[in-house]
Amino acid sequence: MQQFEWIHAAWLAVAIVLEIIANVFLKFSDGFRRKVYGILSLAAVLGAFSALSQAVKGIDLSVAYALWGGFGIAATIAAGWVLFGQRLNNKGWAGLILLVAGMVLIKLA
């Protein structure tokens, strides 16, 4: 395991935020019919992967990727609820709980 440094955690946080922004812009793009939002989404994805590449310099890839994906999904669910009124059904909540449990297990491994 690599030695933890806060700068790598900060890069991971930036990657997560950019992934959420990319997903929101993708929704606003309406299937790339609204080109500006589509381009902004692509730029945010590029930024997210760039930030993730910096994060994995100090965080194991398996941990960084699991946290990036898991937090990105959970926060995108929250953004969908707040911005678009989207709701999870019981199966969706179960999936989210399993996702969070998986992230915890990977971090503890």
From Swiss-Prot:
Lineage top rank: taxon: Bacteria
Transmembrane region(s): 6-26, 36-56, 64-84, 88-108
InterPro entries, alphabetized: Small_drug/metabolite_transptr (IPR000390), Small_multidrug_res (IPR045324), Spermidine_export_MdtI (IPR023737)
Coiled-coil regions listed in the entry: none
GO molecular function terms attached to this record: amino-acid betaine transmembrane transporter activity; antiporter activity; choline transmembrane transporter activity; spermidine transmembrane transporter activity
A Pfam family it matches: Multi_Drug_Res
Subcellular location: Cell inner membrane
Membrane topology reported for the UniProt record: Multi-pass membrane protein
Keywords: Cell inner membrane, Cell membrane, Membrane, Transmembrane, Transmembrane helix, Transport
GO cellular component: plasma membrane
GO process annotations (BP): glycine betaine transport
Main location: membrane
Function: Catalyzes the excretion of spermidine.
PANTHER family: SMR FAMILY PROTON-DEPENDENT DRUG EFFLUX TRANSPORTER SUGE, SPERMIDINE EXPORT PROTEIN MDTI
Subunit structure: Forms a complex with MdtJ.
Family indicated by similarity: Belongs to the drug/metabolite transporter (DMT) superfamily. Small multidrug resistance (SMR) (TC 2.A.7.1) family. MdtI subfamily.
Protein name as annotated: Spermidine export protein MdtI
Lineage, broadest ranks: Bacteria, Pseudomonadati, Pseudomonadota, Gammaproteobacteria, Enterobacterales
Gene that produces this protein: mdtI
